[in-house]
UniProtKB/Swiss-Prot annotation:
Catalyzed reactions: pyridoxamine 5'-phosphate + O2 + H2O = pyridoxal 5'-phosphate + H2O2 + NH4(+); pyridoxine 5'-phosphate + O2 = pyridoxal 5'-phosphate + H2O2
Pathway in which the depicted protein is active: Cofactor metabolism; pyridoxal 5'-phosphate salvage; pyridoxal 5'-phosphate from pyridoxamine 5'-phosphate: step 1/1; Cofactor metabolism; pyridoxal 5'-phosphate salvage; pyridoxal 5'-phosphate from pyridoxine 5'-phosphate: step 1/1
Name this polypeptide is given: Pyridoxine/pyridoxamine 5'-phosphate oxidase
Quaternary data: Homodimer.
Organism, as annotated: Nostoc sp. (strain PCC 7120 / SAG 25.82 / UTEX 2576)
Binding site for FMN: 62-67, 77-78, 83-84, 106, 141-142, 186, 196
PROSITE patterns registered for this protein in UniProt: PYRIDOX_OXIDASE
Cofactor note: Binds 1 FMN per subunit.
Cofactor: FMN
Amino acid sequence: MDRTIADLRKDYTLEGLSEIEVDPNPFIQFKKWFEQALAAQLPEPNAMTIATSTPDGQPSARMVLLKDFDEQGFVFFTNYNSRKGQELAENPQAALVFWWAELERQVRISGRVEKVSESESDYYFYSRPANSRLGAWVSNQSEIIASREVLEQRMQEFQHKYENQEIPRPAHWGGLRVIPSEIEFWQGRSSRLHDRLLYTLLNDHSWEIHRLSP
């Protein structure tokens, strides 16, 4: 065993997380924590890991950016033909993880996934810088390419194609919404006795809260 890795550890001492203090609505609680992450000026507080899997259970995970959230769910945008897009089309379940190290906090979210409306995808797509919109056309995401020059050549081609005209949203690009059935809030505590509060969605659409052992 490499002790330089095994001995890496940090004791968490900032604050606790109490059932009495949290909001009974997990979306309101998430908003509170997210606003605190923004106020702390964390780098990309909307960065999250999304884990997907094939129907036979082969998992994959990657970082994406949260672009919206409300009581309907948590929204991100992607190429629907990418690996995650294809896996979610076949198995529309996902897990999200936010890690805010400076606040010693983690949020885990799991639930089903659905596409957002065409109008929602359009609204976000047309708010993006022109080169980002072109990038949605240039990249056949997750496909093997021979070299970076392939991307640069395709960028030049699409820059020429859409010169002096509006860049349309590709049909294969848009938003996905994770509709949670569980949301867990984790607060680091001393001696690895962390606080974990799990919100679970009930059949009547209310949420119950349970404390989990760390």
